[in-house]
Regions:
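Active-site beta-loop-alpha junctions enriched in small/polar residues
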Residues: 18, 23-30, 46-49, 78-80, ...
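Histidine/acidic-residue-rich catalytic or RNA/ligand-binding cores of hydrolases
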Residues: 31-37, 53-58, 83-96, 116-132, ...
């Protein structure tokens, strides 16, 4: 969880207009943020633990709470966050996580988080140029409007509403 200083920092950060990111927190730290936060926050690169049991992926109760608070959840493209068998992920794994988020009513909270900073990426997303392919896969699976919401609209709306 958060230290006493960390708990005290949450409202100070919010007051300063700094968005909190819970992607690297354990479950106890997440609960501490829920207790201290008064504004929406982000999980900049997190997937669904129900689909892949990585400890930094979000539990369903965390997703529901983020939906309730109108937070933003960025899909993580890292292999280990998409599947747990050591094999390379593909678009089907990203779509499974997306579908799970959508079943939890997170359609307005979901965005792209990526994690392009040196992690192990699946071949289907090992460069920014392949975002067009991801957009096509999302549109084919969930429709163009949902795909566009995930690709840019949700993030744009969140940042417009929550940044000074």
């Amino acid at each position: 969880g958060l230290s006493p200083l960390g708990k005290a920092a949450v409202p100070a950060l919010e007051e300063a207009g700094i968005l909190l990111d819970v992607s690297h927190l354990n479950d106890a730290g997440f609960r501490d943020v829920l207790e201290a936060a008064r504004k929406p926050f982000v999980a900049s690169h997190s997937n669904a633990r129900a689909v892949c049991p990585h400890l930094r992926n979000l539990e369903d109760w965390q997703i529901r709470e983020m939906v309730r608070r109108r937070c933003l959840i960025g899909l993580n493209f890292s292999n280990g966050f998409l599947r747990n068998d050591g094999e390379k992920a593909d678009f089907s794994h990203i779509l499974r996580h997306t579908e799970h988020f959508l079943t939890l009513e997170a359609g307005d909270c979901l965005a792209l988080g990526s994690d392009f900073d040196g992690t192990s990426l699946p071949p289907c997303l090992d460069s920014c140029e392949k975002m067009l392919d991801l957009g096509a896969a999302l549109a084919a699976a969930f429709g163009r409007e949902t795909a566009e919401n995930i690709l840019w609209r949700n993030a744009q709306a969140f940042f417009r509403a929550n940044l000074p």
